[in-house]
Every structure is written in structure tokens, then in C-alpha cells.
Amino acid sequence: LNYIRTKSNKPIIFLDSAGRSYMMFSHSLPSARSIGEPLTGHLAIQNHATVKYMLSADKDAHYLAGSSGGYGFIIKFEDFMTQTKNGKAVLSMAENDQLFEPSRIEDVKKDKVAAVTSKGRLLIFSLDELPYLKKGKGNKIISIPKKMQKGKDPETLKFLKILPLKCNLVIHSGRHSLKLNPGNQKDYTGRRGHRGRKLPNRYLNVTRVEIEPLEIQDDGVGKTVNKADSNLS
């Protein structure tokens, strides 16, 4: 189940598993309480593709787009928009790549990217190292050697998150969690496209990544914000 908050005059973007975008206005969807209606009645979804995500924002809003293949780029909301029922190709991906939900960017200059692979490698780098594109594959986010991309259990990019300046990065592995504050994050910080650093052995199988905001006190010391008071995740 996926939902978004929007206004009746705002466009809604639907992204499918093949990286295509489709557009509808929210007022064209049923407003009464019901099970809804099939999107295929309005949009020509490509064969063998399924709708994965919904977006709605102002035209000049920026997003981080990427896939499990380890590539990504920055894109404006207006570049997802299309008037054609067949949609348009936005993200180019290999056959087995999985599309990540695009992440809304608040500060292109200050925000960072946190990338975690399926083998427990973490790389943090400045968001502005990625290009602005209207469509395409993007640039390499994290390096995964070709030999690691083969076999029964190939290494892929598993999590891709926007990491604001004053936030903890919390790595979950089952019942265990590793909290990296802004100071500790430096150990995993590098340049875009590098290999990243392996997490401690207990956290190699990452099951969830959480962004935890800090509240800066008068003495300049950061304090973790109660999750109930935060909308970041």
C-alpha cells in the first residue's frame, strides 16, 4: 500500500518497475471511500511492469533517483511529468535492477547520500557529486566489482538514502542497530563511485536504514529528536 498527500489541482506521478513515469491529476481519481479503480483505465502501463511509487510536488522540487544497479542522478519533479497515456522512460536500468523510491531533496548543496550494498558496504558522499539529468542511467553511486555482481548471490545496491547534515544514520540488522552520528559518519565518507567501507560483521546483512534527526541545543550539542516529533524516516 502506498499513499501521498496532495491537492486536487496537483499532478500525481506514477513510476513503474521499468523506470517509466505516468501522470494523472488527483481530481480524476475517485474521491469517495471505495476500493478505487484500476490505473490501467487511465494509463497504458507497459507489459510486465507494475506501478511501484507515487509522487506529487511542485515542478521545481528535486529528487534523488536510482536503482539497485548502483547508478543514480538528481531530477526535477517536472521531468517526471508527461502528457502521454503511454508515459515516458525516465530511468534506464538493467533487466534485473530494482527501482528505488525517489527521495525528496531539501538541500542539494548540504545533503549527503548514504548508499548501502547487500554485502554490508556503506558509502556516504556529497549529494552534489551526482549530475542533474532529465532521464537516463545516471552516474555510479557506489563501486561493485564485476566479480561480485555474478553468482547466485550477487552484490547490489540495497539502500539509497538522503542524509541531511544534522542527522544520525541508523543501520539495522535484524534486532541489532548501529547508530552513526555525524562524527562517526566520517569513517564511511568518501567520493561518489568509490567502494565504500565494510560495516562491522554483525551488521553486514542490513535489513533497514533509518535517518534520525538531531535537535541542536544552545550549547551546540546535538540531541536525538523523539521519533514522534519527526517526519523523516
Task: Outline where the language-model segments fall.
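Short, structured "edge-of-domain" segments at secondary-structure transitions
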Residues: 1-233
